[in-house]
Each structure stands twice: as C-alpha cells, then as structure tokens.
UniProtKB/Swiss-Prot annotation:
Residues 61-92 are annotated as: Framework-3. It comes from Mus musculus. PANTHER family: IMMUNOGLOBULIN LIGHT CHAIN. Disulfide bonds join C23-C92. Residues 93-101 are annotated as: Complementarity-determining-3. One of its GO terms (cellular component) is immunoglobulin complex. Residues 102-111 are annotated as: Framework-4. Coiled coil: none annotated. This is Ig kappa chain V-III region PC 7769.
Amino acid sequence: DIVLTQSPASLAVSLGQRATISCKASQSVDYDGDSYMNWYQQKPGQPPKVLIFAASNLESGIPARFSGSGSGTDFTLNIHPVEEEDAATYYCQQSNEDPWTFGSGTKLEIK
C-alpha cells in the first residue's frame, strides 16, 4: 500500500496568514501525466469534504484561498488567507493505486 506522511500533525495560524500542509507519498502517485492526490477537510461531526483533486484542481464551490501543488511523491496544500471557518482537520488521499490511502491528518487551529 502507498503510505502518505503528512506534516505537521497540527499547526496554529493567525487569522489572515498562510497555512501550509505537506504530504509525502511512499511512491509516486502520478499516472499518464496526472497526479492522483486529493485533499479533504473534515470538521467534527461532519463527513470529509473534497477541497482539491488531482493535486491542484479546486473542487466546485471551494473558495480560491485553498490551493494545491506538487507531483510525484511531494504535495502541498496552502490556505491563504486563513479564515476562522478553516479550523478543521485536513487529510491528503491518493487515488492512484488500490487501496486508496489517507494521510494521518493535520489539525489546523486559527489563532
């Protein structure tokens, strides 16, 4: 299985500043020119919500302050400017190879 290592496990960011979350895969999640890495946001008591698909594509309805980048094994989620409603846990997920796997999550606190 592909192992996804997220960092940091938690972070606290001041309102209006930038939050950066990294995800490193144990092997490439690229195939035929696309990177099969996705990012999710989960708030307590709610199901995960897709933010970014295929590394850098913004899901419909997601604010443009969320952005994703990377390819191969190294990926980044950026949130800027951070808003209070962004307090949540964020997960990377690869969909290149079965079984699809998730990172362990990053909890974002807004200061």
